[in-house]
């Protein structure tokens, strides 16, 4: 399979730069699969996993809190708000954040509090989904 240059960067640092055969990311309108030669594209990403399939079948999974995906003929760039390796996610902390967000949504003091709690809930659920996908990938090997 043909490859392309893939870069995943956040405001803090570059987290990945290398050759990839495929990239799958969570766009605001659904998951996107990118291969070499994909039509140029600029789209917003929602919190969730970004999966990079390297040459030889190796897969690397990252978690982004949102950002943008830019596709050019030979280069794909993920410009993330924040990004981390999926292996570095803390499942217990994500579950605790999910529980706190649910509680805050129930105890809403204002629309702003509810909106903030809903955003925190979406991020915690996305982290848990990323961890689950990583776990499922590991059990298939």
Swiss-Prot record:
It is a peripheral membrane protein. Belongs to the ATPase epsilon chain family. Pfam families: ATP-synt_DE, ATP-synt_DE_N. InterPro entries: ATP_F1_dsu/esu_C_sf, ATP_synth_F1_dsu/esu, ATP_synth_F1_dsu/esu_N, ATP_synth_F1_esu_C, ATPsynth_dsu/esu_N. This is ATP synthase epsilon chain. One of its GO terms (molecular function) is ATP binding. NCBIfam families: ATP_synt_epsi, PRK00571.1-4, PRK13442.1. Produces ATP from ADP in the presence of a proton gradient across the membrane. F-type ATPases have 2 components, CF(1) - the catalytic core - and CF(0) - the membrane proton channel. CF(1) has five subunits: alpha(3), beta(3), gamma(1), delta(1), epsilon(1). CF(0) has three main subunits: a, b and c. One of its GO terms (cellular component) is plasma membrane. CDD domains: F1-ATPase_delta. It comes from Chromohalobacter salexigens (strain ATCC BAA-138 / DSM 3043 / CIP 106854 / NCIMB 13768 / 1H11).
């Amino acid at each position: 399979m043909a490859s392309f240059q893939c870069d995943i960067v956040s405001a803090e640092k570059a987290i990945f730069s290398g050759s990839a055969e495929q990239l799958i990311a969570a766009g605001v309108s659904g998951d996107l699969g990118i291969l070499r030669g994909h039509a140029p594209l600029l789209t917003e990403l929602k919190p969730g996993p970004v999966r990079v399939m390297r040459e030889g079948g190796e897969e690397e999974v990252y978690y982004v809190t949102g950002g943008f995906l830019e596709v050019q003929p030979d280069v794909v760039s993920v410009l993330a708000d924040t990004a981390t390796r999926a292996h570095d996610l803390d499942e217990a902390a994500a579950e605790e954040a999910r529980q706190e967000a649910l509680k805050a949504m129930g105890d809403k003091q204002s629309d702003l509090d509810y909106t903030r709690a809903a955003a925190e809930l979406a991020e915690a659920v996305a982290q848990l989904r990323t961890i689950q996908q990583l776990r499922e990938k590991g059990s298939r090997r």
